[in-house]
């Protein structure tokens, strides 16, 4: 009842003009970032050159939203949480956050119990991150679990913008790519690699390209698995049989768990 009342008050406040609707990019934030752009790229490159196991990751917006919603609703609602809710910066509905997680990131089934298990998994995986691409204001809610360097997304996602791109490290390596679209990735690598970027170091020649097709379960896509956890275990088992030097993982809500 309280949850419905809070959402009703927020909706009424927006209609009356007392509360403003958040802008689409209001969740973006760079104030936790320690290294930007070229410095961030260089830090990633030097970290990889050390040759030690490391995890470079970022939060998906729906994944972090689910975790933060779970964390803030597990305790009595503070005034600061309520203020952020009324400003549209927080969700207080676990069901709604899991629905978004299913639609946009592939989690299933939509269930409070399964959602709680997912959030616990993420919280347990966060300490494994060595470098985080930081860009979301609500990362502040999981800061206590972090022990990592935080860089901006362009320094991580856009090596083609910088001198000595960190992806140069991939040259001569056995590179595993986990992604739903492995066929197009294979085709681009084999047929267009040298034409994709002006700087050849952005996408160098690997010793071997190893491909694993990730489970695709966004927007309720049917799979052969009972739940997200079974699908994750299938991919973990498949990857554990492979010999590779570095993994590039892009597969929605599965990504951080696989990397950890």
Q: Where do the language-model regions lie?
A:
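Accessory, usually C-terminal, subdomains that scaffold auxiliary metal cofactors
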Residues: 208, 214, 218-260
């Amino acid at each position: 009842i309280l949850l419905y009342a809070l959402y009703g008050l927020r909706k009424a406040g927006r209609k009356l003009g007392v509360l403003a609707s958040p802008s689409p990019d209001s969740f973006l934030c760079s104030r936790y970032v320690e290294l930007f752009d070229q410095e961030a790229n260089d830090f990633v490159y030097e970290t990889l050159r050390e040759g030690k196991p490391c995890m470079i990751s970022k939060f998906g917006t729906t994944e972090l939203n689910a975790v933060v919603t779970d964390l803030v609703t597990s305790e009595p609602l503070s005034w600061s949480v309520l203020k952020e809710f009324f400003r549209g910066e927080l969700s207080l509905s676990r069901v709604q956050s899991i629905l978004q997680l299913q639609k946009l990131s592939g989690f299933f089934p939509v269930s409070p119990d399964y959602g709680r298990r997912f959030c616990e998994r993420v919280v347990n995986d966060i300490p494994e991150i060595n470098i985080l691409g930081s860009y979301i204001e609500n990362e502040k809610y999981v800061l206590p679990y972090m022990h990592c360097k935080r860089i901006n997304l362009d320094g991580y996602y856009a090596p083609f913008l910088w001198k000595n791109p960190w992806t140069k490290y991939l040259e001569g390596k056995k590179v595993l790519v986990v992604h739903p679209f492995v066929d197009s990735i294979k085709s681009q690598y084999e047929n267009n690699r040298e034409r994709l970027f002006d700087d050849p170091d952005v996408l160098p020649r690997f010793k071997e390209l190893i491909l694993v097709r990730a489970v695709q379960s966004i927007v309720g896509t049917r799979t052969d698995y009972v739940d997200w956890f079974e699908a994750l275990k299938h991919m973990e088992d498949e990857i554990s049989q492979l010999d590779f030097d570095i993994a590039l993982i892009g597969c929605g809500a599965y990504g951080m768990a696989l990397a950890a």
